[in-house]
Regions:
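Metal-dependent phosphoester-hydrolase catalytic domains
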Residues: 3-123
Length: 123
């Protein structure tokens, strides 16, 4: 949980990169970079299409704001094995939407949704 992300990070103003980009790796050597496909999608998006892992109610506007704040970053050797990343978002994951009790529990538990990486098939 970075509580920041691409475009909303104070470090971006100071260092020219968001905290997420810094942790993913900014060195020229890709072997030293971590991987998170959701972060990559957000960093490459030019129109604001990005996965989200958190949902906050903005009372004055009477609406919800969503952001990508939670990440699981893995090394290049694990990423090369194509593990299955998942954001347990009750509105954006049809497998969760199909189970109303699970969707309700995720909404009640936190303003952040779990992020998992299934490595069972790759290790």
């Amino acid at each position: 949980d970075f509580n920041d992300g691409p475009g909303i990070d104070e470090f971006e103003k100071l260092f020219g990169h968001s905290g997420v980009e810094i942790v993913l790796g900014t060195t020229p050597d890709p072997a030293l970079h971590l991987t998170d496909p959701h972060a990559t999608m957000a960093l490459q998006s030019k129109v604001g299409l990005t996965p989200t892992t958190a949902r906050f109610y903005i009372a004055p506007q009477k609406r919800f704001f969503e952001a990508l704040l939670d990440f699981i970053m893995v090394s290049p050797d694990l990423a090369a094995k194509a593990p299955d990343w998942r954001i347990w978002h009750p509105f954006n994951d049809p497998r969760i939407t199909a189970i109303p009790d699970l969707a309700d529990a995720l909404l009640a538990a936190s303003d952040h949704f779990p992020v998992t990486v299934d490595l069972s098939e790759v290790i």
